[in-house]
Curated annotation (Swiss-Prot):
The entry's keywords: Disulfide bond, Electron transport, Redox-active center, Transport
Site residues (Contributes to redox potential value), renumbered to this chain: G49, H50
Species name: Invertebrate iridescent virus 3 (IIV-3)
SUPFAM superfamilies, per the entry: Thioredoxin-like
Summary of the function given for this chain in its UniProt record: Participates in various redox reactions through the reversible oxidation of its active center dithiol to a disulfide and catalyzes dithiol-disulfide exchange reactions.
Domain named Thioredoxin: residues: 9-129
Entry protein name: Putative thioredoxin-like protein 041R
Lineage: Viruses, Varidnaviria, Bamfordvirae, Nucleocytoviricota, Megaviricetes
Domain of life: Viruses
Active site location: C48 (nucleophile), C51 (nucleophile)
Disulphide linkage map: C48-C51
Amino acid sequence: MSYNNPANTKGYLVAPIRYLEYKDFNPDGTLKHFRNKTCLVMVQASFCGHCSSAKPAFQNFARKHPEIVCLTVQGDDPVSDSIDRLVKLISTIKPSFQGYPDYLLFRNGVLVPREIDGRSEADLEKFVR
């Protein structure tokens, strides 16, 4: 897990958002490092136009809510050799995952089976409550 974006280029999310890697998950899809925390994960890709338009709301949400750990999975990470395994894991723990962007909510490291209704800050607020 890192605060640094994979390619260190414009358009990537920045701190306080952290980038997740395959090694940050247990084999059962739970998060390793976030017991007793609420975590919001944006699954996104740099080529995705909808992701690009959703990133500012996610970034603002992360800044306004330090009590929630905001994380991201870069679905087209050019540096990671395990991104395919990570996307497959996400598809396994969230069968409704069909593409980018998508959001995952974890409480105490465990996925909360919930779907988000949109990509705005208000939608993110509603999703985590």
